[in-house]
């Protein structure tokens, strides 16, 4: 009996020790406080709406994420053109790098000197939304079908826009060699961090861009009305026009442009309206603008790293960095 009692006591103590150890270490198994499991986070259309918000936030950028429409994408076109140049006498170094490209890797990549990371963040978030929307696994897939389809179509337009921008920056113009030269990597599904897709040709990039736009437009899920800060049908078609024009497909571009002119509510500003219309409070502000990035509060804006500070003269009424000035020829 003494032996059995000893064995029982030892077994009980061991069980208690395992149980106590498990309880003491259970705090190590908590979900990350700053992240969500991508595979289980999107359960219904409300979750999908949150992903949509994150998608548009990536397009907006902020003071830490300026390497897309937060700043760099706007300035890139000016600096690589003929009318704007860097101010070498006293510039802050925030715009001189637009004149050159240099090889970099993920180990020393900086988000402030290349239009690269954030467009792919936009693509990654769009991929996640599209995958969830088309999975058929959302709990309210039937009753919220119209909303889900709209978010899906919007994501395809933004994915096309990001790939279009990347292709134009890092690939040769399509008309040079009909797109046979290297473009950028195409991602149409969520990627693992270890994946390194190779560069597709410019033609393949445009094929993916056109497919996304065509699918979004033909889905009949995009609204025709204007919701500030969000993609609608006419914005998608306007982007389609730009794609066709970039490829030199003028008849296609004209056909879609005439559709927009004839059937949408958008009209060009009159010369007398042009200056005032840039103010969001002006009655004509949305008359011509089909899609604009909405900045709602101080968490959305780029603060001192935005284009306003870059262009503002150091000695002006609202002084900035004065990095960007007009050329003498202009």
Label every model-predicted segment.
Residues 52, 123-126, 206, 213, ...:
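Inward-facing hydrophobic residues that define packing positions of alpha-helical scaffold repeats
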Residues 139-148, 169-203, 207:
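Short coil/linker segments at helix-helix boundaries
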Residues 50, 70-73, 252-330:
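Hydrophobic-face positions in mid-chain alpha helices that act as interaction patches
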Residues 23-25, 234, 239-269:
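Aromatic-residue-lined binding/catalytic grooves and analogous aromatic/hydrophobic interfacial grooves
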Residues 1-22:
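Sec-dependent bacterial lipoprotein signal peptides
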Residues 92-170, 218-221:
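Conserved, well-structured interaction surfaces
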Residues 3, 23-77, 315, 320-323, ...:
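Membrane-proximal, proline-rich intrinsically disordered regions
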């Amino acid at each position: 009996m003494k032996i059995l009692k000893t064995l029982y006591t030892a077994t009980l103590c061991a069980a208690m020790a395992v149980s106590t150890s498990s309880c003491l270490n259970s705090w190590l198994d908590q979900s990350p406080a700053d992240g969500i499991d991508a595979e289980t986070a999107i359960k219904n259309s409300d979750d999908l709406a949150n992903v949509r918000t994150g998608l548009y936030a990536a397009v907006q950028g902020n003071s830490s994420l300026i390497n897309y429409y937060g700043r760099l994408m706007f300035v890139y076109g000016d600096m690589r053109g003929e009318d704007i140049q860097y101010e070498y006498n006293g510039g802050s170094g925030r715009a001189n790098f637009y004149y050159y490209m240099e090889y970099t890797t993920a180990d020393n990549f900086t988000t402030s000197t290349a239009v690269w990371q954030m467009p792919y963040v936009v693509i990654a978030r769009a991929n996640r939304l599209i995958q969830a929307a088309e999975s058929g696994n959302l709990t309210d897939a039937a009753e919220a079908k119209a909303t889900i389809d709209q978010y899906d179509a919007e994501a395809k337009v933004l994915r096309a826009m990001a790939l279009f921008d990347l292709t134009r920056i890092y690939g040769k113009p399509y008309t040079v060699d009909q797109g046979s030269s290297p473009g950028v990597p195409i991602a149409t599904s969520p990627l693992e961090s270890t994946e390194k897709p190779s560069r597709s040709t410019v033609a393949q990039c445009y094929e993916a861009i056109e497919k996304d736009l065509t699918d979004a437009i033909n889905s009949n899920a995009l609204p025709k009305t204007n919701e500030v800060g969000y993609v609608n049908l006419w914005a998608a078609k306007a982007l389609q026009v730009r794609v066709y024009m970039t490829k030199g497909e003028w008849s296609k571009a004209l056909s879609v442009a005439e559709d927009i002119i004839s059937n949408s509510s958008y009209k060009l500003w009159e010369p007398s309206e042009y200056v005032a219309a840039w103010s969001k409070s002006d009655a004509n502000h949305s008359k011509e603008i089909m899609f604009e990035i909405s900045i709602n509060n101080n968490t959305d804006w780029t603060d001192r790293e935005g284009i306003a500070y870059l262009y503002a003269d150091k000695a002006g009424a609202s002084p900035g960095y004065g990095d960007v000035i007009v050329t003498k020829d202009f």
